[in-house]
Regions:
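Conserved active-site-proximal phosphate/metal-binding subdomains
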Residues: 2-120
Length: 120
């Protein structure tokens, strides 16, 4: 929820992915880190999960390799090799300052609790 907030350390490409169509396509993969985790499907995941891809090394070898590859790709302007972790709720992300997001979530929770109380 907080990654798109300006206070987060997420880079612009990660924020854009979370707020765009990429957030609608997540997958559980070992490709990025060597451990199962859910991320937005990008070039790295697509290549790593292709049928002819080599086996993924265990953590931390896979994660260290991904980080090095991502640094090199970013240096050439390619954001498709980043670990862009995201859960199934990623499409619900909203870009706003963290304080505003907390206030919005608090108000939404209060509204949902009131609606629930009205039907129970």
């Amino acid at each position: 929820a907080f990654l798109p907030c300006p206070e987060s350390a997420a880079d612009d490409a990660y924020r854009a992915a979370l707020l765009g169509d990429a957030a609608r396509t997540t997958t559980l993969t070992k490709v990025i880190s060597g451990r199962p985790a859910r991320g937005m499907v990008n070039e790295f995941i697509t290549l790593g999960e292709s049928p002819d891809a080599p086996p993924v090394p265990d953590f931390p070898i896979a994660y260290d390799a991904e980080r090095a590859l991502n640094r090199a790709a970013k240096a050439s302007g390619d954001a498709g090799y980043a670990a862009q972790w995201a859960g199934q709720g990623a499409p619900l992300s909203r870009a706003m300052p963290a304080a505003n997001l907390v206030a919005t979530l608090r108000a939404e929770l209060a509204g949902a609790a009131a609606r629930l109380a009205a039907i129970v």
